[in-house]
Design a protein with these regions (language model features):
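N-terminal amphipathic/hydrophobic targeting modules at extreme N-termini
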Residues: 2-15
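N-terminal Rossmann-like FAD-binding beta1-loop-alpha1 element of flavoenzymes
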Residues: 27-54
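Short hydrophobic core segments
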Residues: 30-32, 55, 152, 177-192, ...
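Glycine-rich FAD pyrophosphate-binding loop
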Residues: 46-70
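N-terminal glycine-rich dinucleotide-binding loop that anchors FAD/FMN and/or NAD(P) in oxidoreductases
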Residues: 66-99
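Feature captures the FAD/FMN-dependent oxidoreductase FAD-binding
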Residues: 99-181
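Glycine-rich loop(s) and the adjacent beta-strand/alpha-helix scaffold that form part
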Residues: 181-227
Length: 319
């Protein structure tokens, strides 16, 4: 086999590598993902005089914002305490959140023309439309260069001869960019239809980051029982408890439970779901208990059911 040594040298010679880099677009700050976090990051960088490029693989920015709060977007909460965050290392999370707390969040959007509406601590835009928040952030990105329907496929770290990080080569489905700094706000795996499909984890792991196996952390429960079809549409204030297979209480919460055709949902369910998800990820057999009538004792409930049976003998009281 013959090899053209001249051509080979021309390809790998440092001067040619530099020439290749010159042909790539140079970007001071490249943000991967144009969701809520990406838009906020871009707005903050622009306010400080940064030149920003945002790469978003969907056809619009902030698509997941539009689905938040059933289309109303509760963008912060006035009731915040460290114990509200069901995560490992909640103290560290709390410290980070205090750096840009609910007061600063409300002030940020109010100055941009979005006035808050308080609903029992949940803060919505006064219009009660998520699009108000999305458009507000969009206006702050007027000076950013935004690429739609372009997906990042790889990131390579540029290391100098002295071992110093000099930037990143970002490869996409359409081009290559030489970025001085990158901010990855690509989301997790929560909503593939909105762009969060988890592909970024592979790229981040390649760069040396530790990736904890992702599991659903805010989700509803699909139940195997057939009677759930009969309770679809019912909402009730109750208590839900999550247990491990050894009957140890993992978490509990109370509030409005939303009963759907194939299971159970609602904020209390979301609050305990991460514990069940993590147990299932470890191939264990956790379970839940639901108290639909916490104001009744077992004896009182039994007497109430007997009373109803006497008053309505033809009415079904069980499934």
């Amino acid at each position: 086999m013959k090899m053209n040594c001249t051509a080979f040298w021309r390809t790998i010679h440092p001067d040619n590598i530099k020439e290749m880099e010159i042909k790539m677009r140079s970007v001071p700050i490249l943000i991967i993902g144009g969701g809520a976090a990406g838009m906020m990051a871009a707005a903050s960088a622009i306010e400080q005089g940064g030149r920003v490029m945002v790469i978003e693989k969907m056809a619009m920015l902030g698509k997941k914002i539009l689905a938040t709060g059933n289309g109303r977007c509760n963008f912060t909460n006035l009731k915040q305490q460290p114990e509200f965050y069901h995560v490992t290392g909640s103290d560290d999370v709390w410290k980070l959140l205090r750096r840009f707390d609910e007061k600063r969040t409300i002030s940020f959007f109010k100055e941009a023309g979005v006035y808050p509406e308080d609903k029992d601590g949940y803060v919505y835009p006064m219009s009660m439309q998520a699009v108000s928040l999305r458009n507000c952030l969009g206006r702050k990105l007027d000076k950013a260069e935004i690429h739609f329907e372009e997906e990042v496929t790889d990131i390579e770290q540029k290391i100098s001869a002295t071992g110093k990080n000099t930037g990143f080569i970002v490869k996409t489905t359409k081009d290559k960019y030489l970025a001085k700094k990158i901010i990855v706000t690509a989301g997790g795996m929560a909503a593939k239809c909105h762009g969060s499909d988890g592909k970024c984890f592979r790229i981040l792991a390649k760069l040396g980051h530790t990736v904890v196996t992702p599991v659903p952390a805010l989700t509803w429960f699909k139940l195997k029982e057939k009677y759930t079809k009969l309770w679809a549409g019912v909402r009730v204030k109750g208590i839900i408890k999550a247990y491990d297979e050894d009957k140890k209480l993992l978490a509990h919460d109370k509030g409005e439970l939303q009963l759907v055709a194939s299971g159970i949902s609602g904020i209390p369910v979301f609050q305990v779901s991460r514990y069940i998800s993590r147990e299932l990820e470890m191939s264990k057999r956790p379970y839940i208990e639901v108290d639909f009538l916490p104001e009744f004792s077992a004896e009182e409930l039994y007497e109430e059911l007997l009373r109803r049976k006497r008053c309505h003998p033809k009415l079904e009281t069980s499934y």
